[in-house]
Amino acid sequence: MEDDAAGRRRPDEEAAVRYGIEVVPFGPYAEPGPVVELARAAEAAGWDGLCIWDHCHFWGGVGDPWVTLAAVACATDRLRLVTDVSPVPRYRPHLLARSVHALDALSGGRFTFGAGLGVAEDLAPLGDHRDDRTRAAMTDEALELVVRWCNAETVDHEGEHYVATAAQVANRATQTPRVPVWIGGWSRPALRRAARWDGWITSAIDETQSVVCSPEDLAGSVTYLRAQGAREGFDVAVNGTTTAGERGLAPAYAEAGATWWFESVFGLRGSHEQMLERVSAGPPR
C-alpha cells in the first residue's frame, strides 16, 4: 500500500492496517540505546512504525522521546515515527516547531506529530495546574503556529496565549501539505479536535493490561469522528498487546476502524530480551 507524501493513505486506496510498536520510555527504555535496538529489530521483522510516550512523571526515570526518536530516525530507513502523545501546553510553540521540523528532516519525511493536552497526573507534580479548558485552548492555538512554522511561514500572531512578530523559526518540512498531526484523548472535544487534523491515537489497554477501549468503543468513536468531518485517509491508531504468533484482538479493532495497531513494549510487560523476542516475531498480521 502506497502513501501520499505525508504518510497518509490516498482517498482512492482501500484501507489496510499497518503495525508498529509502542515504546514506553521507562526502565530500560529510558535510554535511547535499547529503543534503537528494538527499532532495528522491528524494521527487520516487518513492522511499519514506532511510537513513544511523552511523559515526565511516571514510574521513575523517564527518557526524552524527541532525542530517542532522533536516534531511531538515524538508525532506520522505513519505520514511521510518532510521538504518543506530546502534551502541547508543556512546550513553547516555536521550540516545538523546530523539534517537529528536525524529526521530519532526520527521518526523511517519516515523522507524525502525536499531540494532546497532557494529563494532570503528569503535569501537576511539576507545578502545572492549568485546567483542561485552558490547556485545550493553548493546544489549538499552538498547533496552528507549529504547522505554519513547519511550512516555513513568517508568522505574525497575537492570540490568547501566544504572540509572534515576523517570526520564522523553521525551514519547510519534507512532507506535504504538512507533517501529519494525530490527536490523543478520549473526550468528545478531543475527538472533534482530531477530526480537524490527520488522525486519532488511543489505547486499548492501560498499564495494568485492563481493557479501557473495546472494539465496540472504538467503533463508536470512529462513527463520531466521521460525523465531525474526519476526511478520507484519516488514521485511527490503537495501542495494545498480542502474543507472538497470535492475532489477538487486533483484527477486531481493525474491523472497528483502526488503521494502525501499535504493540505496547514496556518494562512492566517483560524484560528487554523478552520484548526483543516479541518484536522479532513480527506483527499480528
Kindly give the residue locations of the regions a language model identified.
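C-terminal helical cap(s) of enzyme catalytic domains, especially alpha/beta-barrels
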Residues: 142-147, 213-220, 269-285
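N-terminal beta1-alpha1-beta2 module of alpha/beta enzyme domains
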Residues: 2-75, 136, 179, 279-282
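Glycine-enriched alpha-helix->loop->beta-strand junction motifs that scaffold or abut catalytic
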Residues: 75-78, 107, 196-201, 256-260
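N-terminal small/glycine-rich loop or linker at the start of catalytic domains
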Residues: 8-27, 118-124, 160-178, 229-235
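Conserved, mostly hydrophobic/aromatic
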Residues: 46, 72, 103, 146, ...
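Flexible, glycine-rich active-site loops centered on histidine and acidic residues
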Residues: 13-31, 89-156
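Hydrophobic faces of well-ordered beta-strands that scaffold small-molecule active sites
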Residues: 19-23, 50-52, 81-83, 111-115, ...
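Short, acidic/polar
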Residues: 30-42, 99, 184-193, 243-253
